[in-house]
Amino acid sequence: MSFYESVFIIRQDVSLNDIDKIVDDFAKIIKDNNGTIIKKEYWGLRTLAYKIGNNKKGHYYFLGLDITGNVKEELERKMKLNENIIRFLTIQADSISSEPSPILKNQSTENAPVIDVTINN
């Protein structure tokens, strides 16, 4: 098993309940393949650097994972097939910090409330 960090951007018009369903689908894939979600953070609805399709904003979500390479490939395949996900990036990491990410630390509570920050060790 290896550590991975994955960030994905969900279309601006998707509801928070639907975002939870998307993340739950990814969590099911991970758990079914003996992986672990170490950390998950909702970074809020943020303005994109440039327009992607008809989207000027997007919901940003971060996952810290302990999974195998095969699970990473399956997650990325599901992200590509999900029409609500407009961009994603998954990288291998040396470890997953138990601290909140710098983006979450700098985030104003007025701009985007934190839905869920979970750290499992």
UniProtKB/Swiss-Prot annotation:
The UniProt entry, under InterPro entries, shows:
Ribosomal_bS6 (IPR000529), Ribosomal_bS6_sf (IPR035980), Ribosomal_S6_plastid/chlpt (IPR020814), Transl_elong_EF1B/ribsomal_bS6 (IPR014717)
Q: Short name of one Pfam family for this protein?
A: Ribosomal_S6
Q: Which Gene3D superfamilies match?
A: 3.30.70.60
Name a GO CC annotation attached to this entry: cytoplasm
GO BP terms in the entry: translation
Q: Does the keyword Cell inner membrane apply?
A: no
Coiled coil residues, start to end: none
Would the keyword rRNA-binding turn up in this protein's UniProt record? yes
Molecular function terms, GO-annotated: small ribosomal subunit rRNA binding; structural constituent of ribosome
> Which keywords are on file for this protein?
Ribonucleoprotein, Ribosomal protein, RNA-binding, rRNA-binding
Function (record text): Binds together with bS18 to 16S ribosomal RNA.
Q: Which family does it belong to?
A: Belongs to the bacterial ribosomal protein bS6 family.
Q: What is this protein called?
A: Small ribosomal subunit protein bS6
Which species expresses this protein natively?
Rickettsia rickettsii (strain Sheila Smith)
Provide the gene name from the record.
Answer: rpsF
